[in-house]
Every structure is written in C-alpha cells, then in structure tokens.
C-alpha cells in the first residue's frame, strides 16, 4: 500500500513518521512536484492539480473539516480527480471539542455583557447593567452538521433556547429544527446569537448579507466559525454601525490573513481570531485516517465521505 502526503504548512516529517507507525504495512512518502509514481491513497490540503490528476486512487483524504479547496479546483480542472475516487474529510478529530469551547466561551461573554463592560472600561465608566434572561437569549446554529451538533450539545448545558437550520430537518433533543430556504426567515426571527457553521458551497457563499441580517432581532450577535466567504463584510459592518448587529466574533474572512487596512480590525464591536476556532489535531487525525483506511481495505462502510454534488 502506497500513501502520498502533501500539506503546505504542516510538519511533513512528523506526519510521515506517525502514519508509518499507525499503518506499518504502508509505504508513506511526501509528495513533491514530478512524483508520478503509483499511490493508493492521497492525504492532502490545498493539493496541486498535478498531485491527484490521472491517479487510480482508492481514496483521497482532505486534511481538514472542509473540502472546498479541492472541490473548487475540481470545477476548473475536472481531470484532477476521477469521479469514482471517494473523497473524505476529517469529520471531527478533536475539532468538535474546540468548536464547543470557542462557541460556549463567546456566548457566555455576550450573555454576561462583558462586551459592554469592556467598552465602559475603555472610558473609565462604572455602571452595572441589567442582566439578560436566558429565555430571551435564543441561540441559532446555521448549519447542522457534525460540528453544529457538537456545539448544540455543549450549549444545552447552559439551558439556552436552541434552534438550528439546515438543508434537511434534524431531530436533536432540545433543539428546534428548521429546514429549507422557506423556513430560514422564521429561524432567524428569534436568534439573539447566530452561530455560522455552514459548509462552503455555491449556495451558501454570501448568505450572511444585508437581507439575512435584517431578519435577525435588533441587537443580535454573530459568531462566524465556518468560512469567510459566507459573510458580505460590508453588509456586516453596516449592520454593526447601525446597531442592528450588536457584536461579531469572527474567526474566518474573505481574505486571509485579514489585510491590515480592513475596517474590521478597529471596529469596537468586532473581535477577531486568526482562523483558530478548530485546528487539525495531528495525532487524532492520524488515528482517524488509519482507522478509515483499514475499513476501506476490508470493504466496510465508513463515515466522512463527501458528496461532491452537495459540497460536504
């Protein structure tokens, strides 16, 4: 069994050694331009077209929760990956826990009005504020996949009203489910906090725009943990300036790194983190990949395969 590996920023040598230890029967090598030798599996992040094109692979693993970098290249270069080759993403590998930590900490930050107290502190102003009430602090999760379900589970502990929206209806205990475009407005109407965990597909690009933001309650909060292309940044800034949106916590952006001249950096109601809400944990990723390859070799059904038409 031959496995090729490519990631532009990961410690390649660590991954090669870890994969060899986890799959001792495999010959694992770092892929470099010009390497056209045979391979059974490819593990990659933002792979060049040359890496995958023309290969009779058993499967490709994207080294992250999203596969948009591969699917976008496939649109321009359909020869990059044969339709018969299954494409897998890392379904969790520790990312769910990280998303839970990030979402819960920020929701509580807003619920306890720490954002308002920070602004008061900046002007040396001492003024206790009225507390928010849980029953009026509905949290909506936009995108009800694996990570969305993890976030919902963690927020249930805090007894907030929860709702989710996705393409198909979900049956999550304690979570009100909305499905399809025809129910999006009703979903948004009560979301005091909107948490975006949508996949990156042609249908979801620019979904968080002026029209969507206007359907939120006045003074809502936005937490974007998915992709920067989901948000029309000028529309968000306008909503923040008007007070329609009271605050935004943004981990992802249309351009990354976020340019120094972006007005998001200096906006008093915006908090920025550099795409760190959930990062791939190498040891857990290697365990998932080795387990999945073993299942594929046995002809077993496995989780995490991407529907190329849907984009996730």
UniProtKB/Swiss-Prot annotation:
Protein name in the entry: Glyoxylate/hydroxypyruvate reductase A
InterPro entries to which the protein is assigned, alphabetical: D-isomer_DH_CS, D-isomer_DH_NAD-bd, GhrA_Enterobacterales, NAD(P)-bd_dom_sf
Gene of this entry: ghrA
Active-site residue list: 227, 275
EC annotation from Swiss-Prot or TrEMBL: 1.1.1.79, 1.1.1.81
Compartment list: Cytoplasm
Family: Belongs to the D-isomer specific 2-hydroxyacid dehydrogenase family. GhrA subfamily.
Enzyme category, top tier: oxidoreductase
Keywords: Cytoplasm, NAD, NADP, Oxidoreductase
The reaction(s) this protein catalyses: glycolate + NADP(+) = glyoxylate + NADPH + H(+); (R)-glycerate + NAD(+) = 3-hydroxypyruvate + NADH + H(+); (R)-glycerate + NADP(+) = 3-hydroxypyruvate + NADPH + H(+)
Transport keyword on record: no
GO cellular component, as recorded: cytosol
Superkingdom in the source lineage: Bacteria
MF (Gene Ontology): glyoxylate reductase (NADPH) activity; hydroxypyruvate reductase (NADH) activity; hydroxypyruvate reductase (NADPH) activity; NAD binding
Function: Catalyzes the NADPH-dependent reduction of glyoxylate and hydroxypyruvate into glycolate and glycerate, respectively.
């Amino acid at each position: 069994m031959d496995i090729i590996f490519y990631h532009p920023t990961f410690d390649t040598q660590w991954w090669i050694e870890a994969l060899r230890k986890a799959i001792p029967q495999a010959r694992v090598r770092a892929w470099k331009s010009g390497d056209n030798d045979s391979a059974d599996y490819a593990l990659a992040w933002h792979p060049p077209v040359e890496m995958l094109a023309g290969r009779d692979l058993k499967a490709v693993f994207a080294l992250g929760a999203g596969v948009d970098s591969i699917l976008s290249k496939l649109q321009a270069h359909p020869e990059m990956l044969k339709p018969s080759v299954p494409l897998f993403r890392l379904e969790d590998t520790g990312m769910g826990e990280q998303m839970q930590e990030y979402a819960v900490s920020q929701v509580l930050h807003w619920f306890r009005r720490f954002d308002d107290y920070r602004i008061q502190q900046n002007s040396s102003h001492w003024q206790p504020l009225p507390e928010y009430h849980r029953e009026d602090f509905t949290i909506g999760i936009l995108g009800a996949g694996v990570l969305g379900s993890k976030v919902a589970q963690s927020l249930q502990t805090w007894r907030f009203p929860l709702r989710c929206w996705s393409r198909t209806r979900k049956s999550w205990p304690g979570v009100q489910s909305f499905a399809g475009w025809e129910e999006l407005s009703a979903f948004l109407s009560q979301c005091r906090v909107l948490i975006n965990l949508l996949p990156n597909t042609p249908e979801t690009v620019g979904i968080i725009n002026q029209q969507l933001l206007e359907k939120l309650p006045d003074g809502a909060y936005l937490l974007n943990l998915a992709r920067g292309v989901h948000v029309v940044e000028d529309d968000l800034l306008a909503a923040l300036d008007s007070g329609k949106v009271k605050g935004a916590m943004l981990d992802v952006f249309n351009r990354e790194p976020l340019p120094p001249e972006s007005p998001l950096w200096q906006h008093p109601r915006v908090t920025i983190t550099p795409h760190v809400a959930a990062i791939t944990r190498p040891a857990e990723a290697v365990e998932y990949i080795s387990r999945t390859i073993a299942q594929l070799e046995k002809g077993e059904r496995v989780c995490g395969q991407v529907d190329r038409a849907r984009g996730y």
